[in-house]
């Protein structure tokens, strides 16, 4: 079901400033920047080996803006890459509560879904199914 850790999400107030920090301090390079309307965020992906650092700046009301207002900038979620997100949600949904009963559109044509954090020891947990070759 789970292939690997896909990315670690970090909420930021200003995406350009955050990119500069991660570039200047850690030497990371931006692979992709895009806007995901479904989640009202602008995101940047910075590869670290096979895992991505995902910087998220809210651009409207939603989960990310709520998180920023309540907690400030910082670690937001961990995302696991799955081979079949529908099957993963069906299996995991028998064991814990799902925030998303069905996958939603994510960045780069992916499909994503979140679990309820309470069932995951208060860790915001996401599944992603990427297009073949992505």
Residue ranges: model-predicted function:
Residues 4-6, 28-40, 59-76, 91-112:
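A cross-kingdom feature marking solvent-exposed beta-strand/loop segments within repeated
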Residues 5-8, 12, 22, 46, ...:
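Short, structured motif recognition centered on aromatic/hydrophobic residues
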Residues 1-17, 75-82, 131-134:
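N-terminal beta-strand motif that seeds the catalytic metal site of vicinal oxygen chelate
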Residues 36-51:
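C-terminal "cap" of GNAT-fold acetyltransferases
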Residues 44-45, 80, 89-134:
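Vicinal oxygen chelate
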Residues 26-29, 53, 63-64, 122-123:
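Short loop/beta submotifs within extracellular cysteine-rich repeat domains
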Residues 16-29, 88, 92-94:
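Amphipathic alpha-helical segments
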Residues 9, 52, 71-88, 121-122:
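Short coil/turn motifs at helix boundaries and re-entrant loops, enriched in small/polar
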